[in-house]
Amino acid sequence: MGSLFRSETMCLAQLFLQSGTAYECLSVLGEKGLVEFRDLNQNVSSFQRKFVGEVKRCEELERILAYLVQEINRADIPLPEGDTSPPAPPLKQVLEMQEQLQKLEVELREVTKNKEKLRKNLLELIEYTHMLRVTKTFVKRNVEFEPTYEEFPPLENESLLDYSCMQRLGAKLGFVSGLINQGKVEAFEKMLWRVCKGYTIVTYAELDEPLEDPETGEVIKWYVFLISFWGEQIGHKVKKICDCYHCHVYPYPNTAEERREIQEGLNTRIQDLYTVLHKTEDYLRQVLCKAAESVYSRVIQVKKMKAIYHMLNMCSFDVTNKCLIAEVWCPEADLHELRRALEEGSRESGGTIPSFMNTIPTKETPPTLIRTNKFTEGFQNIVDAYGVGSYQEVNPALFTIITFPFLFAVMFGDFGHGFVMFLFALLLVLNENHPRLNQSQEIMRMFFNGRYILLLMGLFSVYTGLIYNDCFSKSVNLFGSRWNVSAMYSSSHSPEEQRKMVLWNDSIVRHHSVLQLDPSVPGVFRGPYPFGIDPIWNLATNRLTFLNSFKMKMSVILGITHMTFGVILGIFNHLHFRKKFNICLVSIPELLFMLCIFGYLIFMIIYKWLVYSAETSRTAPSILIEFISMFLFLASDTGGLYPGQEHVQRLLLLITVLSVPVLFLGKPLFLLWLHRGRSCFGVGRSGYTLVRKDSEEEVSLLGGQDIEEGNNQMEDGCREVTCEEFDFGEILMTQIIHSIEYCLGCISNTASYLRLWALSLAHAQLSEVLWAMLMHVGLRVDTAYGVLVLLPVIAFFAVLTIFILLIMEGLSAFLHAIRLHWVEFQNKFYVGAGTKFVPFSFRLLSSKFSDDLA
């Protein structure tokens, strides 16, 4: 848990890898995921690095594997995924694996090419068969003829499509037949008419069934056409037009006998092609099935091998070119494991000289590593979305685990809605190992990754719903109301009590639609409800007034407490980075400013709750009036909340006023004094460095007289940038801006926490409206068919509840809770200017086969 409170302590290590063992050592490091490599060749182009040839080889293997997977998927062969990830292949097996894959690719491409050629021929023959069958009915040929030229005979009794008649017209007759796409028929016919000027006769017929296109493989509707034309020039034009419209043109037989012979030959060839094609497909499937057994492991191995060579390209060679030098960031807790990994890699490679490491001092800021598990990962992602934490600063995710779902539940508080959300999240948690959940769509995967956040959000919503006594907009009477209506009747009191108090009788009850319970009447109010809000408030006409007052005060208390806690966490940062002057000159004035104004407001709210009861509530002073009078230095007309209130309030205002100049000028003046004081001891300006720690700029002395900080810059994780001179103006302006932002932020952020009240009220009112418009109407149906009406009403109510109150309202409360943490809470102590620790780990490669192919 200490790691979750603050990031891991990191160190910079130098690895000395022998050339013969570097590959195996990085393979072991990739399996363990211990270190993050630094690029020592930033000025070298990626095409000029040492292992660029090996990287290209891996890319070629990836291309081959992608082709194999494409063919396997096309054949509908299942791709098995291994339960365990295979290790990176040894170097001596890489060439063998490359030869096997290349040989398999060549064989597959050849078989696939032959298969496609056979399939195309088969489809063309099938089209030819259909064309012959359909065109047989187009025209009649009474006798076989040869084209000749004759005189023009009379045409009164001749059929237009009789070929003997056409022959006698004195022109040379030709035919073009084939198939055309259904969508191109009209344009095709218009083009023929315009180009051929009417010297063609086109006849169409639609095929009964769609056929597969031999070129594209798409199944479409086809039209069979037969074009009769006169003259060779017209024939050339017709053929060119057919080519432009991608028509499938086939030879047209001149005689019925020729048609019969062609048809018989086509049937024989089609049967032969079917037989050959089936055998080819069977052989291809056998090859693909055999390849599918090992393709998963090959893909993982190639990806690991490529990652290793990318890391090797980030290393530099020594002067002898026999040793690779790498610089890595490593958690100090994993240094022993790092040494063991290097020893294991050297042993597996069989090298005589082992690889080794040593730590080196550095003044650079290390990356941030916060170890998480499946429960804390979601909350850490919420924090990292704002900004990765600076090195070694307090991590808000530890507290977000509780505060985030709690603030969400304050806005979403409903026992019924929270219980439904809890059940949904619990279902995801119990089935978290189900493979379909990890491979689901993006929205469902988002819910799955945040299942523990949803679980706590639902659980806290149940808790706040019990406090609000709100279950689907209705109150639950678990312990019995503590308000007694019968005690308000005059018959239950003595005559003396009746004269002193306003009591009820039958006449008052009949003539007044609204009656008020007086808690000062004995027996009316019997103490507070054991847990949550009394259910009788659900019947009161002033229910909203009471709930608004309660939720508004609760929001203010929670908000100020949340922000004060953030300022206190900043003190832990200053202590850790040895900036103790920041505690006295920044954190304490901020706390005094916050507590003397807004902390006192919380005190007045709680004091009024404790001192004034229901019986004395009429004499209680208004907190709003008292708080305004505090700043106007006005005396209270009601005598105040407690004796000596004016003196206490003036003291608090005095402390608030005095804390502002300290907050504005304290830190810059102290740094100026520190700078001049150290200069008097003989340390020049060059003895100072400007330490950029997150977004702050502080000046510290690095000379031998530095007693407090000494040489702890490495421990503090500060990025040091040498500065030529001490710029007091820049430091002063930075601190003034920060102070103004904080003082104004205390007011605006406190008002921002009122969204807890606003969204809680909106959720409750929307839930109440939904109940009144649906369930209230459905439950009042008292006819014999009431059940039949109620069932669809309940179903519609459930659907609207899920989509509106759970999803839409839940998303709204979720976003507002994120806003409260990012802006109002984290800006009090969290800088978030770090870089995330990204280790060289094979686990970061996708474990799902479908993603590996992308």
From Swiss-Prot:
Q: One MF term in GO for this entry?
A: proton-transporting ATPase activity, rotational mechanism
Membrane-crossing residue ranges in chain numbering:
394-412, 415-431, 446-475, 550-569, 588-608, 652-671, 740-764, 786-824
Using the UniProt record, give the first listed, main subcellular location. Answer: membrane
One GO biological process this protein is involved in is: vacuolar acidification
| Similarity field | Belongs to the V-ATPase 116 kDa subunit family.
What is the protein's known function?
A: Subunit of the V0 complex of vacuolar(H+)-ATPase (V-ATPase), a multisubunit enzyme composed of a peripheral complex (V1) that hydrolyzes ATP and a membrane integral complex (V0) that translocates protons. V-ATPase is responsible for acidifying and maintaining the pH of intracellular compartments and in some cell types, is targeted to the plasma membrane, where it is responsible for acidifying the extracellular environment. Essential component of the endosomal pH-sensing machinery.
Its subunit composition reads: V-ATPase is a heteromultimeric enzyme made up of two complexes: the ATP-hydrolytic V1 complex and the proton translocation V0 complex. The V1 complex consists of three catalytic AB heterodimers that form a heterohexamer, three peripheral stalks each consisting of EG heterodimers, one central rotor including subunits D and F, and the regulatory subunits C and H. The proton translocation complex V0 consists of the proton transport subunit a, a ring of proteolipid subunits c9c'', rotary subunit d, subunits e and f, and the accessory subunits ATP6AP1/Ac45 and ATP6AP2/PRR.
Protein name in the entry:
V-type proton ATPase 116 kDa subunit a 2
Organism of this sequence: Bos taurus
